[in-house]
Amino acid sequence: MEGLPLAKANVEAVVRIQTWLEASIRAHQTVGVETVLSTDKYRRLVTEAKQRQFAVRLFFVMLNSPDLNVQRVRLRVEKGGHDVPEESIRKRWNRSLAQLPWFLDQSDQAAIYDNSGAVPRLVGRKQNGATVVDPDAPLAFREALGLLAGPDRK
């Protein structure tokens, strides 16, 4: 995609990876996808993989707040990495958590990590159909899974 304007190159890259993923699943080849999970575009892919008897494994790495996401992107930019507008970071953080329950439900195994501290911490997992969540997992994660109710939502 050399020589293309950045926006056009990004679109071309998305089309190519989607085509490759679909072909890989049809050929029953193992695939892995990294995404911020801020859209539902991979739902169809997961559904097709499940229909073709793939085991679906989810590794979800989160931060405990959109503010921390903004800070991490600023640090990345300071080190020469790419920038993302703050508004986009905040929207994606919320949409990612909104998408999580569906993908967790579809997964055969899952591990959810809170990467807010110096060391990532396992805060949830799914195995053999059972999902276990650390009671000290970030509030937003527990809310996304509908684990909080009543006036004492801590």
Feature map (PLM): residue ranges:
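Conserved catalytic network of the ASCE P-loop NTPase/AAA+ motor domain
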Residues: 22-26, 48-53
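A glycine- and Lys/Arg-enriched "phosphate-lid" helix/loop adjacent to the NTP-binding pocket
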Residues: 52-100
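Short, flexible loop segments at the rims of nucleotide/cofactor-binding pockets, characterized by
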Residues: 7-12, 34-35, 88-90
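Short glycine-/polar-rich loops that comprise or flank the Walker A/P-loop
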Residues: 28, 52-57, 106-109
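Amphipathic coiled-coil/heptad-repeat helices and related helical stalk/stem segments
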Residues: 13, 17, 41-42, 96
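Conserved substrate/cofactor phosphate-moiety recognition/catalytic segment
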Residues: 1-29
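Acidic, metal-coordinating catalytic cores used for nucleic-acid/nucleotide bond scission
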Residues: 33-43, 63
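NTP-dependent small-molecule kinase module
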Residues: 102-154
